[in-house]
Amino acid sequence: LLEAYRGSISQLEWMSPATRQEALAKLEQFTVKIGYPAKWRDYSSLQLSATDLVGNVRAAEAFEIAYEAGKLGKPVDRDEWHMTPQTVNAYYNPVMNEIVFPAAILQAPFFDLEADDAVNYAGIGAVIGHEIGHGFDDQGSTFDGPGAVRDWWTEADRKAFEERTGALIAQYDAYVPADVAAHYEQLGQAAPHVKGALTIGENIGDLGGLGIALKAYKLALARKGIESFDQAPVIDGLSALERFFYSWARIWQQKSRLERAELLLATDPHSPNEFRCNGIVRNLDEFYETFNVVPGDELYLDPDQRVTIW
């Protein structure tokens, strides 16, 4: 994934040599943490009760506040994790310029030792690409390689970046989750839309993550002497790219109550899963070629409307 980002950044036509050099330097300084921390937190002083829920919440909050206050005046612990190993998630920490992948996300549907590369690159590969992408999104791009807030962009490059992110914001502003749309149609009211500006950081991560994962998969095939996706083996009647895109769709399967969907729509910096999947693939040319998507199809976007950032 890092190699794919390196190659992509090196070839970006909208980025000047000065900014490209800074971006590549930041990429080389990423720290990667996988699985679990080198040392474990000690929770022995946290006293909990099986019969006092509110008391437990208060005790946990007090414990955490004391833990954070105890860091004052001490050197920064660069080995610290801010997510437990049993959490199915991952994160990017801009002040450390680190990407962290807990053990729990290294399982199906994201990663499966029995699955082929197409499936895994669209799963954990896209997650890795997403977290790297946060280093170059609307917020992460304001930090440099060592993790300091610094403007390392030329004015023209920042403008070009914002033009692309603006187009992505406009795409997502138009989306309404299917269940929410159906509910408001019954009410005869206008349905709330995805907030493109609120979700732009995560949408940049998703778009870059899947696009770079696809490039990384192509690099992996090339190492095996396979020069194109068409030459990759067909498995269970599915081509390599079909398996890739189906794997991407699978990781975003979700069921939720309408009330939950509306709450997330109003407050969550992540787009609804429906659009984390469909809103991304419609920007990738390979999706159109794989499934013969043509004008008139629901996910079709004119080529000049498709957004590529990284």
Where are these regions (language model features)?
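Intrinsically disordered, low-complexity linker/terminal regions across diverse proteins
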Residues: L1-E131, G135-W310
